[in-house]
Amino acid sequence: HSKDGQAKTTEAERVLVAPSLTWKPSDRTSLTVLTHYQRDPKSGSYGAVPSLGSAFDNPLGQLDPDFYDGDVNWEEFDRTQIAAGYEFEHSFDDTWTVRQNFRYLETDIDYRSVYPTALAGDNRTLGRASIYSDERTKSFAVDNQIQAKFTTGPIEHTLLAGLDYWKLNS
């Protein structure tokens, strides 16, 4: 999917595919396999415009609604994410249920941007700064749960306990 951004020369583009498959070998057991591929070669602009000249009047004039404060020759946003995982659930009976969820994620992002810092006192000079980030991350998480549903007299209870583990390498 591709679209023009709010500001001049900015565009957003995304490709996303996220198929999943659920298998239920019995009425008490299910396994869902999840996958995800996302590619964002463009992501619009993260810049901003000063309030004077856009939301509020500036005695020196108004900014165009599509004013762009960046640098089209330097800015870049390029991200790829790949993920896979599963959700497993098994009910032993009407009281006890166990679950395990797992996810693996890889992200690759290259980001360069120019952004405004402040409008100077002359109401016409916009200070700017830049940011650059080149990151590669890999992470995985596993979530284990045990659940008990029961009653004591007129009160219904749901007891949930679990253990999570998450690791991130960047």
Spans of model-derived segments:
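Short acidic, gly/pro-rich beta-turn/loop elements at beta-sheet edges
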Residues: 6, 43-45, 110-112, 154-156, ...
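Face-selective signature of the C-terminal outer-membrane beta-barrel domain
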Residues: 82-107, 130-170
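Transmembrane beta-strands of outer-membrane beta-barrel pores
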Residues: 1-4, 15, 37-41, 104-110, ...
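Outer-membrane beta-barrel translocator/receptor signature
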Residues: 1-17, 25-29
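Acidic/polar loop-and-plug regions of large Gram-negative outer-membrane beta-barrel proteins
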Residues: 18-24, 28-91, 106-137
